[in-house]
């Protein structure tokens, strides 16, 4: 059975993330969305909230599980008995960073491989940071994030929401 890990902060999950999850779930028997706990970073959502939001969004994809982890990704992968990392790429700049991370992971564990999936053209500009910025100023985030999480994001900001 092939099992892959799609790691990230997902703060918040975007339609770009969901696209990668959906496509990767068709390539691997099991996909674990690994939600990174970063104690040094104050996120918009707690790790528990992020896990719950993602679970809500992927509930109809039967071979996708969502779990949080802290520490090294390699350690989480060993615990989950996975040897494949899935990463989404939007631009060349993403590739440069992710290539370095892939090489580091390979150095830490030679059995680990990284599979890069290109973002769909309609999501190539999308990031969690840009979604937060738009939402912070009351802009429309419909089409940027799954419908199931729009209200949760809006509630985090004390702004009037503009419908599209």
From Swiss-Prot:
One of its GO terms (cellular component) is cytoplasm. ATP binds at residues 9-10, 17, 88-90, 98, 123-129. InterPro entries: Cyt_trans-like, PPAT, Rossmann-like_a/b/a_fold. Its cofactor is Mg(2+). GO terms for molecular function: ATP binding; pantetheine-phosphate adenylyltransferase activity. It catalyses: (R)-4'-phosphopantetheine + ATP + H(+) = 3'-dephospho-CoA + diphosphate. Substrate binds at residues 9, 41, 73, 87. Pathway: Cofactor biosynthesis; coenzyme A biosynthesis; CoA from (R)-pantothenate: step 4/5. One of its GO terms (biological process) is coenzyme A biosynthetic process. It is found in: Cytoplasm. Keywords: ATP-binding, Coenzyme A biosynthesis, Cytoplasm, Magnesium, Nucleotide-binding, Nucleotidyltransferase, Transferase. The keyword Magnesium applies. It holds the Pfam family CTP_transf_like. The record marks 17 as: Transition state stabilizer. It is an enzyme of class 2 (transferase). Transmembrane segments: none annotated. Its EC number is 2.7.7.3. Reversibly transfers an adenylyl group from ATP to 4'-phosphopantetheine, yielding dephospho-CoA (dPCoA) and pyrophosphate. Belongs to the bacterial CoaD family. Homohexamer. This is Phosphopantetheine adenylyltransferase. It comes from Clostridium kluyveri (strain ATCC 8527 / DSM 555 / NBRC 12016 / NCIMB 10680 / K1). The lineage of its organism: Bacteria, Bacillati, Bacillota, Clostridia, Eubacteriales.
